[in-house]
Amino acid sequence: MEKIANAVKSAIEAGQNQDWTKLGTSILDIVSNGVTELSKIFGF
């Protein structure tokens, strides 16, 4: 869950700084880490 929180923080900071490339990669990190956490929960 820490990775998701860090990715959200990075996305917020990138949005505030109008760093669109970092914002895009942060959003992908959120999705990727979310899928990883769900996989752990459901045992995939």
From Swiss-Prot:
It is found in: Secreted. One of its GO terms (molecular function) is toxin activity. InterPro entries: PSMbeta (IPR008846). GO terms for biological process: defense response to bacterium; killing of cells of another organism. GO terms for cellular component: extracellular region. Its main location: secreted. Keywords: Antibiotic, Antimicrobial, Cytolysis, Formylation, Hemolysis, Secreted, Toxin, Virulence. It comes from the Bacteria. The modification N-formylmethionine is found at residue 1. Belongs to the staphylococcal hemolytic protein family. Has hemolytic activity and also inhibits the growth of gonococci. This is Antibacterial protein 2. It comes from Staphylococcus haemolyticus.
